[in-house]
Amino acid sequence: MKNILMTIKDCDTATITSPIVEKTLELASYRSSRVHIIHVAPPPRDPPYNIDSKMLRREIASELRHEHNCLQNLSKCMQDMNINATALLVRGSIINMVLHESERLAVDLIIIGRHRHGPLYSALMDGTDKGILAKSSCPIMFVPV
């Protein structure tokens, strides 16, 4: 396992002490693996007719800068712990982008944080994890968060 892709759903809650980060650090240090931290931002869309498009673009740019900084800080913390880590902020469909980047980077393992929810929530809202699981060509590890 030389290449690990760790997915981050929420940049604001991803810290060096997050369960998904701790598990990734454990695996990466044990195997001397490279870690690719990925966060997929939503694809660009047309603004509603009643919203100023310049204001919306500024707001989106500010949010993307914030997410990028969070990912870079997490990557830096991992590097300070002697883990070869890089951060990726991409835009698009979560399933497609995670699969695309996993193939492009030739990862050996995808690590995904998994929230504990009831069966109703899982039936209605959990398509991302199932989509990646169904289409991935490499192993996937789910970490409870």
Where in the sequence are the language-model features?
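Short, flexible loop segments at boundaries between secondary-structure elements
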Residues: 135-145
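Glycine-rich, Arg-bearing micro-motifs that act as flexible, cationic patches
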Residues: 109-135
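Structural beta-alpha unit
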Residues: 76-110
